[in-house]
Curated annotation (Swiss-Prot):
GO CC, alphabetical: cytosol
GO MF annotations in UniProt: protein-disulfide reductase activity
Name of this chain's protein: Thioredoxin
Keyword presence, Transport: yes
Highest taxon in the source lineage: Bacteria
Record has Disulfide bond as a keyword: yes
Ranges for domain Thioredoxin: 2-104
Similarity comment: Belongs to the thioredoxin family.
Keyword terms of this UniProt record: Disulfide bond, Electron transport, Redox-active center, Transport
Organism: Staphylococcus haemolyticus (strain JCSC1435)
């Protein structure tokens, strides 16, 4: 599955079921740009097992505030609508895969 862009208005419905890795990012963030290809690879690797979502914190401040996102990129793993893990800053693919695997 391709990466899905989510907003404040559709965030909750997108995380309700299954495992989701949400990338809280912004267009001006260098490390956010660096992690983008890693997330694209993960989206392919985890197709059918977990979904990768992206939320622009500048355009969607309510959701970012709700989950206390202070630094970006912040990646939060949700399982059936509940946050179960959080990673802040650029991470290599192997680290993110390890985090996802814990919740599958």
């Amino acid at each position: 599955m391709a990466i899905v862009k989510v907003t404040d208005s559709n965030f909750d419905e997108n995380i309700q079921s299954g495992v989701k890795l949400v990338d809280f990012w912004a267009t001006w963030c260098g490390p956010c740009k660096m992690i983008a290809p890693v997330l694209e690879e993960l989206a392919g690797d985890y197709d059918g097992k977990a979904d990768i979502l992206k939320l622009d914190v500048d355009e969607n401040p309510s959701t970012a505030a709700k989950f206390e996102v202070m630094s970006i990129p912040t990646l939060i793993v949700f399982k059936d609508g509940e946050p179960v893990d959080k990673v802040v800053g650029f991470q290599p693919k192997e680290n993110l895969a390890e985090v996802l695997d814990k919740h599958l």
